[in-house]
Amino acid sequence: MNGTEGPNFYIPMSNITGVVRSPFEYPQYYLAEPWAYTILAAYMFTLILLGFPVNFLTLYVTIEHKKLRTPLNYILLNLAVANLFMVFGGFTTTVYTSMHGYFVFGETGCNLEGYFATLGGEISLWSLVVLAIERWVVVCKPMSNFRFGENHAIMGLAFTWIMANSCAMPPLFGWSRYIPEGMQCSCGVDYYTLKPEVNNESFVIYMFIVHFSVPLTIISFCYGRLVCTVKEAAAQQQESETTQRAEREVTRMVVIMVIAFLVCWVPYASVAWYIFTHQGSTFGPVFMTVPSFFAKSSAIYNPLIYICLNSQFRNCMITTLFCGKNPFQEEEGASTTASKTEASSVSSVSPA
């Protein structure tokens, strides 16, 4: 074995020299230089400085403005809540542990940090699944008399939390486990060992099939059909120009969210799967650390995409920040008509 396995950790370094120590008790500076841990702490602190305000603002603005409380926005709010879970449950602890060079909060802290990080990522993924299905229903009209309303949005929210917890909770109750990963300053699911005592192999396979491959397949199907339908509608001019423009705006926003999610999480998932399927292979701590911490940046991009691409939300946000006034009203005015149409039409379907 090219690593050292303990009762509750796995370190990607052989202990032939005797320098390997528990990541819960000793600084791990034999894995990387102290300055690397300082950079890690600074990076995570930056994510907190950006992630908390932008996600909190998303929640506050939506609650403040009644016209933003549409079924579609319920799911987008769910993304903001998931991101705040990651910020408070994962980022803050990682800043502190990186400054010390090891996971100072012990096994219990590792379980909590791993749970919140996994929960936030899974809520985001399943929220994107619900958004993809919503876009498919609204634009492709597979059920001509179906109307996507508040009750469907609430059921979608419940679904995302149930699925996310079905992935994040088992390691807390003996099916797999959370352990320090990479440079040993943050925790995640154990991809490094088979650990038959906790049936680790079966959980990792379950996680990759049910909580990664299945949602990506659903998203791919929905947007594959979506692209075809949008092209056909544009060619036949079945909808009014204003409605088409509003639907395109929302669809583009959701598609970009999905692409950004894949850019952030696919490298992490790919590296994790490689490590799991190549047990005993040699890899350095940075090999897992870089994609892991790159994936954490996902807590920032969704609200930024929403703010940049949704003109109605952007106008409400500016109004909130400037105490009821919008100094950029003339610039925002050009898209007001499309925004109003979007609020009333993108989450409903009239008979085909």
Curated annotation (Swiss-Prot):
The keyword Magnesium does not apply. Phosphorylated on some or all of the serine and threonine residues present in the C-terminal region. GO terms for cellular component: plasma membrane. Disulfide bonds join 110-187. Residues 1-36, 99-113, 177-202, 277-284 are extracellular. This is Rhodopsin, deep-sea form. Pfam families: 7tm_1, Rhodopsin_N. Rod shaped photoreceptor cells which mediates vision in dim light. Glycans are attached at residues 2, 15, 200. Keywords: Chromophore, Disulfide bond, G-protein coupled receptor, Glycoprotein, Lipoprotein, Membrane, Palmitate, Phosphoprotein, Photoreceptor protein, Receptor, Retinal protein, Sensory transduction, Transducer, Transmembrane, Transmembrane helix, Vision. Residues 334-352 have a biased composition (Low complexity). Residues 62-73, 134-152, 231-252, 310-352 are cytoplasmic.
